[in-house]
Amino acid sequence: RLVGHEIADLNHLTHLIQGAMEKNSSAKAAVEIAIYDLWGQLYNAPLYRLLGGGDPVITTDITISVDYIDKMVADSMAAVERGFESLKIKVGKDIGVDIERVKAIYAAVEGRALLRLDANQGWTAKQAVYALQTLEDAGVRLELVEQPVKAHDLDGMKYITERVHTPVMADESVFGPMEVIELIRMRAADIVNIKLMKTGGLSNAIRIADIAAIYGVDCMIGCMLEGSISVAAAVHLAVAKSHAITKIDLDGPSLCAFNPVDG
């Protein structure tokens, strides 16, 4: 369906890509990234410039995977020594252990790195409120908590958002523009996580960032376990939409044993 169309007709091309099939967002993202790359080559300019961006310097966090508490503390301290100033701590299995591991990591890196929690839908709404209030009462200051409850549970997200000081971020709850509109309408989260592999590429990611900016909702740009090409596309988006995308979680390539592609 794309053969024979001009690369300059970008909006029409992305419309065709998004309408080509249901779901399959990663496949759509791969094709869109290639199209946007050709668009940049057509005008001999980096993508972030064509999208209106300025300073091309951003800083990512690094993920600390779930493990024994001592191992997570050691991994966190090693990440800080490598220069990372934001750590994304995986939680969401055992609520009591989660609280203790976060306290231990916070004590080890306080003043040197910010902590973000990612529960990966692992808590109930009441568990999340209990854990976050317990940490807040203990003096643990968190930058955010990511997707504490199941993706479909917007009422649970709203319940948490209304009861804790820690900003709540939606990840799996938001795949496209319609979900972010509903999330904002319900006031069910403070931050939205954009991932190109969820949105089906750059076109919907741009729409999400623009919608969020209109309503004063911050965004994070995130990734799956991805190689350098898709993460590079996300970097261009982050630079172009830096007024909306204020947090960066693009550590995917650093978590891969090797880069499967060149380019």
Report each predicted region and the residues it spans:
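Metal- or metallocofactor-binding catalytic centers and their adjacent structured scaffolds
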Residues: 1-42
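Conserved active-site and cofactor/substrate-binding residues in soluble primary-metabolism enzymes
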Residues: 8, 12, 22, 26, ...
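Flexible, glycine/charged-enriched surface loops at secondary-structure junctions
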Residues: 8-12, 46-50, 142-148, 223-224
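Shared catalytic-loop signature of beta/alpha-barrel
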Residues: 19, 152-169, 174-263
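Hydrophobic alpha-helical scaffolding
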Residues: 21, 25, 95, 147, ...
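Conserved, mostly hydrophobic/aromatic
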Residues: 31, 44, 87, 105, ...
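Generic detector of well-ordered alpha-helical packing
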Residues: 33, 38, 89-91, 119-120, ...
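Metal-dependent enolase-superfamily TIM-barrel catalytic cores that perform enediolate-based chemistry
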Residues: 50-164
